[in-house]
Amino acid sequence: MSPISPPASGVGLGYGIAIAVSILVLISFIMLASYICIRSKSTGRDEATSDVVLDLPSPAAEVKLGLDRPVIESYPRIVLGDSRRLPRPNNGPCSICLCDYEAREPVRCIPECNHCFHTDCVDEWLRTSATCPLCRNSPAPSRLATPLSDLVPLAFQIR
């Protein structure tokens, strides 16, 4: 008797072709779905952008965080002499623009903390923020709550 050999059928080849066709169909479906999603998002962005523009609050509802010009102008303004020394011993550069102070340059000091800065720098800063750029304390007449001013009393209570 001779050994029995398996039938010579194309069953193994049929599975390979079926798997390859299935993978190609799946890849095609994923690419089509991605194209549709990207296409719908790009057209949806234009509509969403126009909705946002239409739903903006009115300028009357704008909140101003900085100080008014008369308050800023009330802070002492000095012109540096040839020695270029500031009234308080913070002889480093301006903390806002990081430039050195020059002779005969106008400097404005914040009365609450005595920190000094270039007049143009600190005026612009105080128009947008009501705190000292260096120590973050509020120079405003109506004491605004600042992170540092809240922590200082706590530090004295611990001791």
UniProtKB/Swiss-Prot annotation:
A zinc finger (RING-type) spans 94-136. It is an enzyme of class 2 (transferase). It catalyses: S-ubiquitinyl-[E2 ubiquitin-conjugating enzyme]-L-cysteine + [acceptor protein]-L-lysine = [E2 ubiquitin-conjugating enzyme]-L-cysteine + N(6)-ubiquitinyl-[acceptor protein]-L-lysine. InterPro entries: ATL67-70 (IPR044289), Znf_RING (IPR001841), Znf_RING/FYVE/PHD (IPR013083). It holds the Pfam family zf-RING_2. GO terms for cellular component: membrane. One of its GO terms (molecular function) is transferase activity. It is found in: Membrane. Pathway: Protein modification; protein ubiquitination. Its EC number is 2.3.2.27. GO terms for biological process: protein ubiquitination. The chain crosses the membrane at residues 13-33. Coiled coil: none annotated. It is a single-pass membrane protein. Its main location: membrane. Gene3D superfamilies: Zinc/RING finger domain, C3HC4 (zinc finger). Keywords: Membrane, Metal-binding, Transferase, Transmembrane, Transmembrane helix, Ubl conjugation pathway, Zinc, Zinc-finger. Belongs to the RING-type zinc finger family. ATL subfamily. PANTHER family: RING-H2 FINGER PROTEIN ATL67, RING-TYPE DOMAIN-CONTAINING PROTEIN. The RING-type zinc finger domain mediates binding to an E2 ubiquitin-conjugating enzyme. This is Putative RING-H2 finger protein ATL69. It comes from Arabidopsis thaliana.
